[in-house]
Amino acid sequence: MGRGRVQLKRIENKINRQVTFSKRRAGLLKKAHEISVLCDAEVALVVFSHKGKLFEYSTDSCMEKILERYERYSYAERQLIAPESDVNTNWSMEYNRLKAKIELLERNQRHYLGEDLQAMSSKELQNLEQQLDTALKHIRSRKNQLMHDSINELQRKEKAIQEQNSMLSKQIKEREKILRAQQEQWDQQNHGHNMPPPPPPQQIQHPYMLSHQPSPFLNMGGLYQEEDPMEMRRNDLDLSLEPVYNCNLGCFAA
């Protein structure tokens, strides 16, 4: 007796429904992978659970490319079937297409941030890890390149500053040398001009023959002249020519 055909209907038990969903989902993903490998086909599988969780499978993680290809194909097919379709319908389709693309990008962003990873299979996690490793390699390579460029720029500036300092030091030394030479020349010229003349030969004179001019001096009574030293000397010796002069006159008179 053959096996009877099982009627398909919704499983009322929540736990049984969840277990069945997990088993069938794994089988469906396995079948999709097998057909993509055996037949060299591009497969894209999208499944939403009753809680709204997304489960997907794509050949070589090319979900975006497959969806874009599907949209182009379906859009071209619709244009051939109904070339005179309403413009509003086209705008609605474009809106739905862009909305689906935005949702896909947001989901990928959450995956890159380590969120909503429960619904991903081991292969999807492995592909995500490879993408992150590749991104990290590019980031580190760019960072090392920037650091290398910064170091080269600092070394170039340091070399330029050293050359400038060397040039300034050389100019300062040359300037100091010129100033020392000018100072030595100036000292030699000043030494030659400021030498005192040799003293004149001394003449021996009698003390009484030295000319002496009376010098005025100020006294409380008025202005007086200093007394002549010769007169002072004559008075000190109490010598006078007046008696001799009178005597000679008397002799001539007699």
Swiss-Prot record:
The keyword Transcription applies. GO terms for cellular component: nucleus. Residues 3-57 form the MADS-box domain. GO terms for molecular function: DNA-binding transcription factor activity; protein dimerization activity; RNA polymerase II transcription regulatory region sequence-specific DNA binding. CDD domains: MADS_MEF2_like. Controls floral meristem identity. Is also required for normal development of sepals and petals. Is required for the transition of an influorescence meristem into a floral meristem. Interacts with LEAFY. This is Floral homeotic protein APETALA 1. It comes from Sinapis alba (White mustard). The lineage of its organism: Eukaryota, Viridiplantae, Streptophyta, Embryophyta, Tracheophyta. The gene is AP1.
